[in-house]
Regions:
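Basic amphipathic alpha-helical segments that dock to polyanions
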Residues: 47, 72-82
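Short, amphipathic alpha-helical interaction segments positioned at domain boundaries
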Residues: 94-130
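Short acidic, hydrophobic short linear motifs in intrinsically disordered regions
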Residues: 41-63
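Conserved, aromatic- and glycine-enriched, well-ordered alpha/beta core segments
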Residues: 60-67, 73
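A short, conserved structural fragment
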Residues: 80-92
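Long, low-complexity, charged/polar intrinsically disordered regions in eukaryotic proteins
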Residues: 1-30, 34
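Short amphipathic alpha-helical elements of helix-turn-helix/winged-helix folds
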Residues: 31-39, 50
């Protein structure tokens, strides 16, 4: 579930307004889960960079800035509490390398992809070759 502060927070310093979609937290959580599956092991800082963008600095040139690390960290904690992701450590167990997908998380992503495959093939006819 989305935290109570999710209705008022911006998704990064590069944004001027908070999100307008009512379900943006759940869409972001699904995107984070997919990114962990594709890019893992990945941490909260690198995840925030994935959701960053150009900051408007007025007359000066735009610069790339990270998204909100609190949002990324909170979503990673929620996914971890649901046993969809776990922390990966080095062989000695002393360094946390980031989050990786569990078997439960992978099966959830596979089920979701299988559920929308039919409608995706109807919308994009050439998709069946992949």
């Amino acid at each position: 579930a989305a935290p109570e502060w999710a209705d008022y927070v911006k998704t990064g310093s590069h944004r001027e307004r908070p999100p307008v979609q009512a379900d943006w937290w759940y869409v972001r959580s699904a995107a984070v889960l997919r990114k962990v599956a594709m890019m893992g092991p990945i941490g909260a800082n690198h995840m925030a960079q994935q959701f960053g963008g150009p900051k408007d600095r007025g007359v000066k040139q735009n610069r790339a800035v990270s998204g909100s690390r609190n949002i990324a960290r909170t979503i990673l904690q929620q996914l971890s509490s649901c046993d969809l992701i776990i922390s990966k450590h080095n062989l000695a167990g002393t360094v946390n390398l980031g989050k990786i997908l569990t078997g439960t998380g992978q099966s959830m992503l596979d089920d979701a992809a299988h559920a929308v495959r039919g409608s995706a093939e109807e919308k994009y006819p050439g998709l069946s070759g992949f």
